[in-house]
Every structure is written in structure tokens, then in C-alpha cells.
Amino acid sequence: MTRFVNRFVISDHHLGHTNSWEKFKLSDGSPLRPFTSTEEMNETMIERHNAKVKEQDTVYFLGDVVINKKYLELVKRMNGRKILIRGNHDIFKDEDYREVGFEQIHGVRVFVDKFILSHIPLHPDCVTERFRVNVHGHLHANEVMRTRTNMVHGYMTGLVTEPDPQYLCVCVEQTDFTPLHFDEVEERIQQRWKDTGYTGPVKAWGNGSGPN
């Protein structure tokens, strides 16, 4: 019998990243992370994770979990069956991640939901009809953008630059430092498709669940 579980996704915790609230800035100079200490940042993300994720749930971490190896121990305090898709800062040995609770470690993970999970956004040629949405990290507060021709009543009225509907960034800065349930992922994708006039369907498991 197939067992179904709730699934969540999140990226770029940077647990233990010293002074990251000072180093990471928005374009207007305001802080990207609203914390005043590394400990506050770590504890806030762990608390929000555990408030949403239960032990039997599955969580996909899309890379850059920690910068300093010693902070990997914090992962032990986070609920759920943990799966890592490596990012550019996940440079330690597989066994180091397994020791703190990651059951699987991947480069890119592909789902029947037609999501591709990755750390760095993939080249558009990889996000084809077969895999229509790249759920990714790495960009923090930014998004993959596209420029298209705007048409009104058959006439070109100019160019529009907007978030690319085939990409969704799930970095902590864009998820309120909380994992997103797969239902929430689909809702965000559908809203973006509505906003941009994109019509490709997303197939998802009922209630954000899927085969374990």
C-alpha cells in the first residue's frame, strides 16, 4: 500500500551565517533578514519550521543549509524526514549531512508533479513541456525574470518585464522563513500564471501529498 505524506520545500537557510542580516541587503539598502543576531535568526527559522512540519512529514531543503560545518547540528532539531538538494555552499561530505538527519542527498530532484527542484535556477531549455516549473533557491529576494511583447487587441504596445512563470523561488526570504507546503507552492504558481497570462497546467497530488 502506498503511504502518503505531507511535503514541504524551503531553501537557503544559511544557518549560522554570521552577520548575514547586515551582509544581505535589498536594493534600497534595507536588511534582507530582519534579525539582530545569528542566534535569533537560527532560532526563528527552527521554531517556524517545527510549528508547521511534523515528524512524519517530508521536507526538501534546496541547498545552502549552513555555511559553517559546526552549525549542521542545528538540523537535528528540525522536524520531518529531511531530503537535501545540494547548493553551492553545501560542500561537506554526504556522511556529514546524513549524521544530522538528511535521509537523501541529490543534485536535482524531479517530480511527477512536473516540478524540478534545484538550488540554482536551471537553464530554460531544461524547463520544457515535460517539466514545466523549476522550484529553486539561490536568489534570496530576487526572481528569474522574463521580457515579453505585450499585445492588446492584436497590437504590440511595448515590452513587459515580469517574473518568469516557469520558475518559483522558495528562499527563506520569500517564504517568511517558513517551509512551504506543496499546496502553497501550487497556489503561488497558479497565481503567477494568472498574473502573467500563462496557461500551462500544474498536476499536483491531492492535499499536497505524494508517494513517500
Identify the role of each PLM range.
Residues 1-62, 66-212:
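Extended recognition/assembly regions associated with phosphoester-bond processing machinery
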